[in-house]
Amino acid sequence: MNTKVPIYSVSGEMKGEIDLPEVFDTEVREDIIRRAFRAISLSMRQPYGSSPLAGMRRVGHTTRPGLGISRMPRIAGGSRVVGIASAVGGKSAHSPRTTKNLYVKINDRERKMAKYSAIALTASVEAVKKRGHRFKEGLKLPIVVEDGVEGINKTKDAIALLKNLGVYEDIERSREGKHIRAGRGKMRGRRYKQPKSVLIVARNSSAMKAFRSLPGVDIASPNSLSIRKLAPGGVGGRLTIFTEGAIESLKEVDQ
């Protein structure tokens, strides 16, 4: 099924139409999207573990039988037990190991299906609205712009483009949604949480620096698209802007 969507210029005016690649007709499998997101997120965990010397920094002496006390290692001249898991301040019986393999496997076909399903959901108005994104009524998704937007080098010009396209309201939603997270994470370098807004997919993603400082905006190239950017939190339907060159690159995707 060839679906046509409008192409917008740098000024936000419609300049033509383009056929969407077959990847946008992929069967949507939200369960596989969640599974792939979980596998990728868990695989990014940082290994952690306790010190090999934890609980073993005291010298303990084992007593002989016949003294009426248990034969556990104790400090010299005292009765305090040290160096075993059941002792106060002793070592952990089965502490975390930094050598543990935290990688979570997922089938290649499932990983590809998750990515293609997430791309297909970017063209669903219902899925994008359900995710909470805000945009102009009657806007046809996905949004495709000409390659000239890669030459935008000022943030004020980027804001003007997003306003002309009718998606700047989603940037405001992300800015207003920034809040201090609950729990200990606020003390560990991740104090704030902020909703994701627009994803911009461009063939030359490194050239689109003008969009980087906008709240919740992510930039990616067609080759670096990941389920973490297409479906944050494992929920597909992210509001996405593709450049004309990025759409052409997606036509080469092997279904």
Swiss-Prot record:
PROSITE patterns: RIBOSOMAL_L1E. InterPro entries: Ribosomal_uL4 (IPR002136), Ribosomal_uL4_dom_sf (IPR023574), Ribosomal_uL4_euk/arc_CS (IPR013000), Ribosomal_uL4_euk/arch (IPR045240), Ribosomall_uL4-arc (IPR019970). GO terms for molecular function: rRNA binding; structural constituent of ribosome. Keywords: Ribonucleoprotein, Ribosomal protein, RNA-binding, rRNA-binding. It comes from the Archaea. The keyword RNA-binding applies. One of its GO terms (biological process) is translation. It holds the Pfam family Ribosomal_L4. One of its GO terms (cellular component) is ribosome. The keyword Ribosomal protein applies. Disulfide bonds: none annotated. Part of the 50S ribosomal subunit. One of the primary rRNA binding proteins, this protein initially binds near the 5'-end of the 23S rRNA. It is important during the early stages of 50S assembly. It makes multiple contacts with different domains of the 23S rRNA in the assembled 50S subunit and ribosome. Forms part of the polypeptide exit tunnel. Belongs to the universal ribosomal protein uL4 family. HAMAP family: Ribosomal_uL4_A. NCBIfam families: rpl4p_arch. This is Large ribosomal subunit protein uL4. It comes from Thermoplasma acidophilum (strain ATCC 25905 / DSM 1728 / JCM 9062 / NBRC 15155 / AMRC-C165). The lineage of its organism: Archaea, Methanobacteriati, Thermoplasmatota, Thermoplasmata, Thermoplasmatales.
